[in-house]
Amino acid sequence: MEPAAGTPGPLIMNNKQPQPPPPPPPATAQPPPGAPRTAGGLLPGGKAREFNRNQRKDSEGYSESPDLEFEYADTDKWAAELSELYSYTEGPEFLMNRKCFEEDFRMHVTDKKWTELDTNQHRTHAMRLLDGLEVTAREKRLKVARAILYVAQGTFGECSSEAEVQSWMRYNTFLLLEVGTFNALVELLNMEIDNSAACSSAVRKPAISLADSTDLRVLLNIMYLIVETVHQECEGDKAEWRTMRQTFRAELGSPLYNNEPFAIMLFGMVTKFCSGHAPHFPMKKVLLLLWKTVLCTLGGFEELQSMKAEKRAILGLPPLPEDSIKVIRNMRAASPPASASDLIEQQQKRGRREHKALIKQDNLDAFNERDPYKADDSREEEEENDDDNSLEGETFPLERDEVMPPPLQHPQTDRLTCPKGLPWAPKVREKDIEMFLESSRSKFIGYTLGSDTNTVVGLPRPIHESIKTLKQHKYTSIAEVQAQMEEEYLRSPLSGGEEEVEQVPAETLYQGLLPSLPQYMIALLKILLAAAPTSKAKTDSINILADVLPEEMPTTVLQSMKLGVDVNRHKEVIVKAISAVLLLLLKHFKLNHVYQFEYMAQHLVFANCIPLILKFFNQNIMSYITAKNSISVLDYPHCVVHELPELTAESLEAGDNNQFCWRNLFSCINLLRILNKLTKWKHSRTMMLVVFKSAPILKRALKVKQAMMQLYVLKLLKVQTKYLGRQWRKSNMKTMSAIYQKVRHRLNDDWAYGNDLDARPWDFQAEECALRANIERFNARRYDRAHSNPDFLPVDNCLQSVLGQRVDLPEDFQMNYDLWLEREVFSKPISWEELLQ
């Protein structure tokens, strides 16, 4: 049977009819010449409505914009990550670095180029450069640092192509790492951080520019290139390079630098910058290096997935129902939902209908006539060939504004395509089974059995079947197991024994972050706020442009345009780095221990992270994702290999020819994932989403046709649908359909209605306070040794061991020992009888 024309689309798949290309949108609000005058009645009613709808679709790009070919990964391509390190204002410094290297190189090697030397000669010269970093004169030290930076940049003056530069970069970087450059740079960086003279002069300056951070920028550039290059694995890597990579990762995550991991030093730079004590710090480079350090030491998202599977096996939990990374990669984007103006217009038209109820019934009859999920065998082959999973085109049947026309004649092959199944396996928590059994027992028996999930005596057969289905899909998370174990430790501290804490990189990093974690979170969010495109320039906001503004401000229009692009790009890179750091830390801490994650998440919430992210999305998100804030001819390594063409206003405006900006889409997805992490299973935080009116903001973000971004937007909408009221759900049926199709289902989750217990009034403050108490108990038990209960500490009663302990006495005490003996021992009477008794 052929499907009826206009068969409902959102809950089921849309007809694949060949559509003619849409006409271009009109340039003005006036109708184009020859346009049908619907008001004058020159077209029949149905045609006029169809024309209006097409016009509206075209003007909004409604479902016509193509899917964005974006693949989410830990980082962008290596070349893009290298180019984002440098601002365009730093362009002249490439030649300065080359000059410093060649002056020094010619003093020792006169007849050969760097690329013509053998490995031993390379190593000798690298060690000679390293020795030059130990001189006391700042100018000489800076020249040597620039020479090392030129080596790390791939000695581009002797290369003829970008690929050759990148090849020499890898070789030179591993060479520099081998001779111990990174540790020497860490010491120099520490010295620059504590350079009070530079800090005080920067504080007094009214305007800070690139020149104020020269030393720091050179050091951070070299360190970033080492971390980024060593972290990237290539097929042609030598065996010793792989060994060096593993050693470097271990060292970077170990407390070798001032008894703390290197990342803590960078976090310290961030807080010092935000406090106003060091406004000259090049924050973009610090944040990029911090992100790559965390990524290198803790591991990326695929590594995290394998660690999660491994940890589940250790805890005796069943394997994950699916690989979430693969599922998301195979998803297709849905069409953007209709805008509010469309919905209002449709409702007004419906209000004027005389036979509204009848029409709705007709639509529902047509909808029920043919169940699209009952796919017959004849359609299987076609479904296998068609992987377009998107919800396109048609509005939901209840949203229609006209009686359904008679079926049109379609070709035989043009069938209604149906999804094979939902992408995610449903999950059920133990708590959900308990609640279901409790309500069933109250209803059928009249009493409850608490947390007993096995006794089903007296319950009818259908309830037995329901419980069986729920238990089949039961999912126990690592976090639940960790929380139960923590309760056991607190309940029985003596019989529980000493907890064995595995010193993995995430644990070491958490221990380093713990004393000042609230300050670190506030500092990162302050910078994120300053870099957000929606934030207005305020006098009290921090200046994040210290490492992009030149000493002399531009004098021509072209220079101003170039600086404008540079500043926007600079802010985008900062947002990218902060969003990636926060997401990585949240995910790794959640895997390591749930209360480490909750501690960080709670401080993010207290620092207003939720409204900040919503404020970020309260902009034209399509414009942000398709922004062209880059000048490809000035990107490294292109700019050091090719002749620089003359820049024009047109070339600056054109930007690159990419469909979207990778870093901006990456940032948006990261921020949505952070928002999901903060609000998941937290009713108080979900209510913050409702209070801050996030639904229209998030709904606008659905216009971006990228499956992963849409998934996280739909997740955030799903958790608050029960609070948004019946009218919102009725007006947003297409969004509800997309949630049903793309977001994981909880079998007895009444998310689409307001009947759930969770939707009733809740003591939000008590919820956060209880969580905070659990976190504080965890931190005190595991990390706060000073406040341990003395009754549970081991006692040494052996006289020999006490007398054998070495006691370091202060020098002044040793000099006045005779005086102390006379005053404290000999002059005081001792009652020997009482002492011996």
UniProtKB/Swiss-Prot annotation:
Places the protein is found: Cytoplasm
Sequence ranges of Acidic residues compositional bias: 378-391
Modified residues (N-acetylmethionine): 1
GO molecular function: protein-macromolecule adaptor activity
UniProt keyword terms in alphabetical order: Acetylation, Cytoplasm, Phosphoprotein
Primary location group: cytoplasm
Listed GO biological process terms: cortical actin cytoskeleton organization; cytoskeleton organization; negative regulation of hippo signaling; regulation of cell morphogenesis
Coiled coil: none
Compositionally biased spans, kind Pro residues: 18-35
InterPro entries membership: Far11/STRP (IPR040185), Far11/STRP_C (IPR021819), Far11/STRP_N (IPR012486)
Residues annotated with Phosphoserine modification: 59, 335, 339, 788
Region (Required for STRIPAK core complex formation): 796-837
Function description: Plays a role in the regulation of cell morphology and cytoskeletal organization. Required in the cortical actin filament dynamics and cell shape. Part of the striatin-interacting phosphatase and kinase (STRIPAK) complexes. STRIPAK complexes have critical roles in protein (de)phosphorylation and are regulators of multiple signaling pathways including Hippo, MAPK, nuclear receptor and cytoskeleton remodeling. Different types of STRIPAK complexes are involved in a variety of biological processes such as cell growth, differentiation, apoptosis, metabolism and immune regulation.
Quaternary structure (record): Part of the core of STRIPAK complexes composed of PP2A catalytic and scaffolding subunits, the striatins (PP2A regulatory subunits), the striatin-associated proteins MOB4, STRIP1 and STRIP2, PDCD10 and members of the STE20 kinases, such as STK24 and STK26. The STRIPAK complex can be extended by adapter proteins such as SLMAP:SIKE1, CTTNBP2 or CTTNBP2NL. Interacts with CDC42BPB. Interacts with CTTNBP2NL.
Protein name listed in UniProt: Striatin-interacting protein 1
